């Protein structure tokens, strides 16, 4: 018997207007209901094609299908981290504590230096993509990486702890072409408790995505 599981859109852990004034309710609703849902649908469509291929019911362009799966599945995964990585003003923002603060100081020198490097990474993604903070288990270190689109330039073994979407759909309705202001304001809603939980999972050899 050949089967593949299907992905579903996770609910947001807060209301669509909860991140205002930094991210508008209109952006959040469109981003979640349309864009994220589109990545879920795209991943499931690719899986359906693969399932039919494995059953001998259809021929496919394997390269194209796997490219689609990589793009849409990574879009789904990154957004599933992005939403809980944020919290309403007052609950999000500020400086981290706990182990994540210790490791940020160890690998970046200070929170201020980390924030500047991460912001520059986000502002300078070429085209569309993400800035991410990862725990890299091979050398047990924190790294800041850029992802182009959803699936290019990512370290294969890295556990994503913090993700910032810099596709235009994440900010354009509110910030127009001013990605820099969006990135600067995003720090006011970063959920450091969520980042800490992901780090603790990664340090214990567990999957940081599953909280």
UniProtKB/Swiss-Prot annotation:
GO molecular function: metal ion binding; superoxide dismutase activity
Cited Pfam families: Sod_Fe_C (PF02777), Sod_Fe_N (PF00081)
Enzyme class (EC, first level): oxidoreductase
Organism: Pyrobaculum aerophilum (strain ATCC 51768 / DSM 7523 / JCM 9630 / CIP 104966 / NBRC 100827 / IM2)
Quaternary data: Homotetramer.
PANTHER family: SUPEROXIDE DISMUTASE 2 (PTHR11404), SUPEROXIDE DISMUTASE [MN], MITOCHONDRIAL (PTHR11404:SF6)
Encoding gene, per UniProt annotation: sod
Entry binding sites for Fe cation: 31, 79, 165, 169
Family: Belongs to the iron/manganese superoxide dismutase family.
Cofactor note: Binds 1 Fe cation per subunit.
Catalysed reactions, as listed in the record: 2 superoxide + 2 H(+) = H2O2 + O2
Gene3D superfamilies: Fe,Mn superoxide dismutase (SOD) domain (1.10.287.990), Iron/manganese superoxide dismutase, C-terminal domain (3.55.40.20)
Protein name in the entry: Superoxide dismutase [Fe]
Functional description taken from the UniProt entry: Destroys superoxide anion radicals which are normally produced within the cells and which are toxic to biological systems.
């Amino acid at each position: 018997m050949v089967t593949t599981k299907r992905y579903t859109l996770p609910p947001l852990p807060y209301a669509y207007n909860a991140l205002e004034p930094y991210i508008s309710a209109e952006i959040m609703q469109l981003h979640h209901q349309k864009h994220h849902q589109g990545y879920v649908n795209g991943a499931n469509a690719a899986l359906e094609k693969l399932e039919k291929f494995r059953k001998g019911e259809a021929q496919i362009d394997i390269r194209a299908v796997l490219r689609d799966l990589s793009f849409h599945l990574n879009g789904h995964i990154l957004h599933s981290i992005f939403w809980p990585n944020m919290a309403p003003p007052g609950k999000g923002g500020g400086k981290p504590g706990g182990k994540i603060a210790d490791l940020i100081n160890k690998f970046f020198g200070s929170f201020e230096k980390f924030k500047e490097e991460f912001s520059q990474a986000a502002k300078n993604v070429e085209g569309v993509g993400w800035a991410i903070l990862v725990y890299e288990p091979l050398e047990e270190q924190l790294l800041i990486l850029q992802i182009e689109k959803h699936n290019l330039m990512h370290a294969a073994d890295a556990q994503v702890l913090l993700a910032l979407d810099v596709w235009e759909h994440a900010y354009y309705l509110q910030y127009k072409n001013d990605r820099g202001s969006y990135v600067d304001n995003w720090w006011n809603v970063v959920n450091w408790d969520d980042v800490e939980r992901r780090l603790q999972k990664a340090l214990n050899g567990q999957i940081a995505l599953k909280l």
